[in-house]
Amino acid sequence: MNIFIKGGRVIDPSQNIDETLDLLVVAGRIKELGKGLKAPADAEVIDAAGLLVTPGLIDMHVHLRDPGLEYKEDVITGTMAAAAGGFTSVACMPNTKPVNDNKAITSYIVNKAKAEALVNVFPVGAITQGSKGENLAEMGELKEAGCVAVSDDGRPVVNAELMRRALEYAKGMGVMVIAHSEELALVGEGVMNEGFTATELGLKGIPWAAEDVAVARDVYLAEFTNSPIHIAHISTKGSVRIIRDAKARGVQVTCETAPHYFSLTDDAVRGYETNAKMNPPLREAEDVAAIKTGLADGTIDAIATDHAPHHLDEKDVEFNVALNGIIGLETSLPLSLKLVEEKVLDMKTLVEKMAVRPAQILGLDRGTLKTGAPADVTIIDPKAEWVVEAEKLASKSKNSPFLGRKMTGAAAYTIVDGKVVHKRD
C-alpha cells in the first residue's frame, strides 16, 4: 500500500528538518519528502494538517512478558499498546520465563514477533546465564539470533569483575550493554524512596545512594575498559551528575529515563498506591528537576517507558508485597509532550530522544525519514485530549499510576514498514 501524508509539520532531527512538507511512502519505504508533492492515484491520502509527522517512535525498554508470563502481557497486546502509543519499534527485555539467554529463546521471540506483532520487536538478550550474575551468556550467539543489546534488566550484575568482562566481550562483538544499576545491599528491604513520605507511611526506604553508587561503578568500568555502556531508567539527581561528568571526560556512556521520573514524585505513593511502586522508585521534587535539566542539556539521551505489565492480583495487595513496575507505552507520548509545553525541550529535541537516539544507541536502521529508509512514521495530534481509562487501554495489564488523568497529545496514526497499524478514532 502506498501512502501520501499531506501537509503535516514534519520533524526529523536526523535531517535537521522542521517544516510543513508532504511525505510519500512506496512499498514500505520513504520515497520522497518535499513541498507540493503530487499524490499517486493508488495512494492512501492522509491529511496531516495541524499534525506532527515524525520518524516512528522507538521504545528501547519494554517488557513484553513472552515467553512464560503471558498472563501479564504478550506479543500481540504489548505491540497493540505500543502502536496505540505511537511506537513503531520496541526493544524487549530478557527477564522472561525462561530468561532470554540463548539463541533458541531469541529465535522464538523473533519468529513470534514476525507472525503476530503490530510493530518491530527487537529482543535484548541477557548479560549472564539465567540473569543470575554468575556466568556470561553467549553474547555472540544472542547477537547472531537477533538481539540488539544485552542486559540483566530487573537486577544488577553484582560482581564487578563479571561486569568488566561483559563490557570487554560486548565491545569486541559490537553489542551494547544496558546496565540496571542498583546496589542491592543498600536497597535492603526498601520498597519506596527513602525520605519524608516513606517515614510518614511507615515504609522502608531505598536511598538515592543505591542508584548513584551503582551508576558510578558501571560508568567507571566503562571508562576502564574503554567500552560503551547504556544506563537504564535513571531517576536521581546524582545519576544525572555522574553521567554528565563522565560524558565530559569522554566516557562512552548513554542513558535513558522514563516518563514517570519526570512526571511524578514519591508523593504518588500516598494511600499506599501500588500502581506507583516501581524500581527504581519515584524520587523527590529535586530529582524530578534534575532529570528535566539532564534531558534539556543532553546528559539524558533517550526517553524509554520501562513498560512493566503486572496482573491485578500482583498489584492489588499490601504495598510491601506488590510487584514493582507500571505500564507506560500508551501514556509516554502525552507525558513527554508536556516537556515541550513546559519549555524543558523543543519538539525536535523530544523527537530526537524518542526516535533518533534510541535507534542510534541500539544500532537500528530506523529513527529517520530519509529517502530509502523503512517507512516507520508516527503522526501525532498534539492537541488530542483524552482520559486514561483502564478499559480503553490496549495493554493486557492496567497497572498505571495515571488512571483517571486527563492527557493532551496522542498518536493519530502509527505506520510500520508502510502499513497503518494504528489509527486514532
Swiss-Prot record:
Keywords attached to this entry: Hydrolase, Metal-binding, Pyrimidine biosynthesis, Zinc
Residue numbers binding Zn(2+) 2: D153, H180, H233
Pfam families in the cross-refs: Amidohydro_1 (PF01979)
Disulfide bond positions: none
GO molecular function: allantoinase activity; dihydroorotase activity; zinc ion binding
Keyword tRNA processing: no
GO biological process: 'de novo' UMP biosynthetic process; purine nucleobase catabolic process
Residues the entry annotates as binding substrate: H63, L64, R65, N95, N279, H310
Class in the EC hierarchy, top level: hydrolase
Essential cofactor(s): Zn(2+)
Catalytic activity reported: (S)-dihydroorotate + H2O = N-carbamoyl-L-aspartate + H(+)
Pathway: Pyrimidine metabolism; UMP biosynthesis via de novo pathway; (S)-dihydroorotate from bicarbonate: step 3/3
UniProt remark on cofactor binding: Binds 2 Zn(2+) ions per subunit.
PROSITE patterns given in the database record: DIHYDROOROTASE_1, DIHYDROOROTASE_2
EC number: 3.5.2.3
Origin: domain of life: Bacteria
Residues reported in the UniProt entry to bind Zn(2+) 1: H61, H63, D153, D306
GO cellular component terms attached to this protein's record: cytoplasm
Active site residues of this protein: D306
Function: Catalyzes the reversible cyclization of carbamoyl aspartate to dihydroorotate.
Protein family according to the UniProt entry: Belongs to the metallo-dependent hydrolases superfamily. DHOase family. Class I DHOase subfamily.
UniProt protein name: Dihydroorotase
UniProt source species: Geotalea daltonii (strain DSM 22248 / JCM 15807 / FRC-32) (Geobacter daltonii)
